[in-house]
Amino acid sequence: MAAVAARAGGLLRLGAAGAERRRRGLRCAALVQGFLQPAVDDASQKRRVAHFTFQPDPESLQYGQTQKMNLFQSITSALDNSLAKDPTAVIFGEDVAFGGVFRCTVGLRDKYGKDRVFNTPLCEQGIVGFGIGIAVTGATAIAEIQFADYIFPAFDQIVNEAAKYRYRSGDLFNCGSLTIRAPWGCVGHGALYHSQSPEAFFAHCPGIKVVIPRSPFQAKGLLLSCIEDKNPCIFFEPKILYRAAVEQVPVEPYKIPLSQAEVIQEGSDVTLVAWGTQVHVIREVASMAQEKLGVSCEVIDLRTIVPWDVDTVCKSVIKTGRLLISHEAPLTGGFASEISSTVQEECFLNLEAPISRVCGYDTPFPHIFEPFYIPDKWKCYDALRKMINY
């Protein structure tokens, strides 16, 4: 009887594991199809995708020859540069060897071999723990979590191990050469398990850096900075931009400084702050405000969430007197709250209106109701108009 029970228990565990594999398997094919076929607007390469229009930055010739790349290709280029430069660098994660769900590691195993680009079991805590061990030996570990939504099983490894390793050893040991990549944010039809923006969970953890790019050019430069940084870094990649965002990207390696926000557009009346995909939303809002209200907006891409660039944001708010912050994550406890609190403390006497946060709702991320959930340009514009009329 005990043998039958044990066998039944084993079958149940196998069944549960199979269900989990099938559930997670839904991440693959569905999410790289459909909406990720953007329509080209004109020769400027502006692209309308879902709730935003991607706006490429002017081509930079500062770093030599450039090539047209989408965001996932720029990630591949950065990883290629790192593997070529650093013989200790390794890349690993679920399905990484064949190129990854979003093709960010395509061709790298063939070029650098199975000992440097390889698959892992479906176990996020194991992936990060393995990466910590590699980094502690002095090698460069580049771990991939297949979706940011599934980074939570690795939360203990990141928060209690990676982030504290240097401190608890009195700087005798560290895992600063660990970088964790993860596709992030809304995707058009990802629903509650493939759309989350969990950056705020890690913002409360001293010892790690959190970075989110808005474009292919930014992604390559920021990722290379993360890989070479002496602290563990989490690099969230807006997956809706993987194919939708296309611009000229330098072929050779280059770095963009971490913890340094970028003022994309200067203005005098309102400061707009965002990161990742949402930057393109607020850029549209800035254009709408100028056209409809005659309001001049200063647009800031935060880029690094932790440690964030307080000086750039506060300097802008002192000038404009108004601040709107927007992100896809839920409102309560979102990183906009931290920015708002800091600006309130530093710039209180300069504020002309209450700080506005335009964010996702305090609900699980919905499927068919995603268009109502996301903080689109109309929600941001309405909040901006209320600030101006305050």
Swiss-Prot record:
Keywords: Acetylation, Lipid metabolism, Metal-binding, Mitochondrion, Oxidoreductase, Potassium, Transit peptide. Thiamine diphosphate binds at Y150. Its EC number is 1.2.4.4. Pfam families: Transket_pyr, Transketolase_C. The modification N6-acetyllysine is found at K230, K239. InterPro entries: THDP-binding, Transketo_C/PFOR_II, Transketolase-like_Pyr-bd, Transketolase_C. It comes from the Eukaryota. GO terms for cellular component: branched-chain alpha-ketoacid dehydrogenase complex; mitochondrial matrix; mitochondrion. It is found in: Mitochondrion matrix. It is an enzyme of class 1 (oxidoreductase). Its cofactor is thiamine diphosphate. Residues 1-48 form a transit peptide. It catalyses: N(6)-[(R)-lipoyl]-L-lysyl-[protein] + 3-methyl-2-oxobutanoate + H(+) = N(6)-[(R)-S(8)-2-methylpropanoyldihydrolipoyl]-L-lysyl-[protein] + CO2. One of its GO terms (molecular function) is 3-methyl-2-oxobutanoate dehydrogenase (2-methylpropanoyl-transferring) activity. K(+) binds at G176, L178, T179, C226, D229, N231. GO terms for biological process: branched-chain amino acid catabolic process; lipid metabolic process; response to cAMP; response to glucocorticoid; response to nutrient. Heterotetramer of 2 alpha/BCKDHA and 2 beta chains/BCKDHB that forms the branched-chain alpha-keto acid decarboxylase (E1) component of the BCKD complex. The branched-chain alpha-ketoacid dehydrogenase is a large complex composed of three major building blocks E1, E2 and E3. It is organized around E2, a 24-meric cubic core composed of DBT, to which are associated 6 to 12 copies of E1, and approximately 6 copies of the dehydrogenase E3, a DLD dimer. Together with BCKDHA forms the heterotetrameric E1 subunit of the mitochondrial branched-chain alpha-ketoacid dehydrogenase (BCKD) complex. The BCKD complex catalyzes the multi-step oxidative decarboxylation of alpha-ketoacids derived from the branched-chain amino-acids valine, leucine and isoleucine producing CO2 and acyl-CoA which is subsequently utilized to produce energy. The E1 subunit catalyzes the first step with the decarboxylation of the alpha-ketoacid forming an enzyme-product intermediate. This is 2-oxoisovalerate dehydrogenase subunit beta, mitochondrial. It comes from Rattus norvegicus (Rat).
